[in-house]
């Protein structure tokens, strides 16, 4: 394996697993600090780590604490991220600033991918991907998740693109960036809260072994960049697309009226949707992260077996 970058701090559990070639699954921390309310966020983070361990892999939640990129966190670290309102939301552009200032930062999908790759981790589980925002033709608002997927060798397991975004344009950008987009067990690309999006899946896989084979083939060919694995939310937990669509439109209108934009947009929208749905969207969010954690652990095991 490639030695982790010297500026990273790994827990003993993660370091031992990477040294031994055991399966490791990276987890982001923005979902803890900015994606869910306290205390559900810390409970979810702890539960997801437990799911990954029970499935035979080692979880590595990633964040920046006191300016040090951390690969794997303690229970106290998770509590800090979940409850401290001063924790910054950190994408790739922000990493140098937060590290230099020795601040705390919760990593987005993009920053988590970059730090996972520096640690030698190839599988990463999250809730939903960032992408092209609605109205991007005027705002040019696109998530750095996309450019990171185009350049960083990590497979990202999610429930699809966050449904507050323009899913069709996001799929177009992923195609342009040369990123394989695999829908797990479905011919349709999922849309986070819903199993359907109205967009056909670019590619379909039906097992963790298939995903691992695609990962190995891509990187063995020397093709840089990530792999998107879109795992539809369990049917019993989904909010139907036609139902969530109107709720998202209301949340978008509320955001526009408040003049919220940039990296504050997604946290506001997710929080507003929780309010409008009376908590149903939060329940769905937790359910899909659980499902993604199980699948991610299986993929990590299969990929470790190929190495």
UniProtKB/Swiss-Prot annotation:
Gene3D superfamilies (alphabetical): Indigoidine synthase domain
Subunit-structure text: Homotrimer.
Catalytic activity: D-ribose 5-phosphate + uracil = psi-UMP + H2O
UniProt keyword list: Glycosidase, Hydrolase, Lyase, Manganese, Metal-binding
Pfam families: Indigoidine_A
Record gene name: psuG
Protein EC: 4.2.1.70
Functional description taken from the UniProt entry: Catalyzes the reversible cleavage of pseudouridine 5'-phosphate (PsiMP) to ribose 5-phosphate and uracil. Functions biologically in the cleavage direction, as part of a pseudouridine degradation pathway.
Catalytic center residues: 28 (proton donor), 162 (nucleophile)
Known cofactor(s): Mn(2+)
GO molecular function: hydrolase activity, acting on glycosyl bonds; metal ion binding; pseudouridylate synthase activity
Protein name per the record: Pseudouridine-5'-phosphate glycosidase
Protein source organism: Nocardioides sp. (strain ATCC BAA-499 / JS614)
Lineage of the species this protein comes from: Bacteria, Bacillati, Actinomycetota, Actinomycetes, Propionibacteriales
Family statement: Belongs to the pseudouridine-5'-phosphate glycosidase family.
Binding residues for Mn(2+): 141
Cofactor binding note from Swiss-Prot or TrEMBL: Binds 1 Mn(2+) ion per subunit.
Single GO BP term: nucleobase catabolic process
Entry keyword Hydrolase: yes
One cellular component term from this protein's GO annotations in UniProt: cytoplasm
Residues the record lists as binding substrate: 89, 109, 143-145
């Amino acid at each position: 394996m490639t030695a982790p970058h010297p500026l990273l701090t790994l827990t003993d559990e993660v370091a031992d697993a990477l040294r031994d070639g055991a399966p490791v699954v990276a987890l982001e921390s923005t979902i803890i600090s900015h994606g869910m309310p306290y205390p559900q966020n810390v409970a979810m983070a702890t539960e997801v780590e437990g799911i990954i361990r029970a499935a035979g892999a080692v979880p590595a939640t990633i964040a920046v604490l006191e300016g040090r990129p951390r690969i794997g966190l303690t229970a106290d670290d998770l509590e800090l991220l979940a409850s401290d309102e001063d924790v910054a939301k950190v994408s790739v552009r922000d990493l140098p600033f937060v590290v230099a200032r020795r601040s705390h930062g919760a990593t987005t999908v993009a920053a988590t991918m970059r730090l996972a790759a520096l640690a030698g981790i190839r599988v990463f589980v999250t809730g939903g991907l960032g992408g092209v925002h609605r109205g991007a033709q005027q705002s040019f608002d696109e998530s750095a998740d996309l450019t990171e997927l185009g350049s960083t060798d990590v497979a990202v397991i999610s429930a699809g693109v966050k449904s507050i975004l323009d899913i069709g344009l996001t799929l177009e950008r992923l195609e342009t960036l040369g990123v394989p987009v695999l829908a797990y067990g479905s011919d349709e690309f999922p849309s986070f809260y819903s199993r359907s999006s109205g967009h056909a899946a670019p590619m379909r896989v039906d097992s963790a072994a298939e995903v691992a084979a695609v990962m190995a083939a891509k990187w063995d060919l020397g093709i840089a960049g990530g792999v998107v694995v879109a795992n539809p939310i369990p049917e019993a937990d989904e909010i139907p697309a036609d139902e969530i669509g109107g709720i998202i439109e209301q949340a978008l209108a509320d955001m526009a009226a408040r003049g919220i934009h940039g990296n504050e947009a997604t946290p506001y929208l997710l929080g507003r949707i929780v309010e409008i749905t009376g908590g149903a969207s939060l329940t769905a969010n937790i359910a899909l992260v659980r499902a993604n954690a199980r699948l991610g652990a299986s993929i990590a095991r299969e990929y470790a077996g190929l190495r």
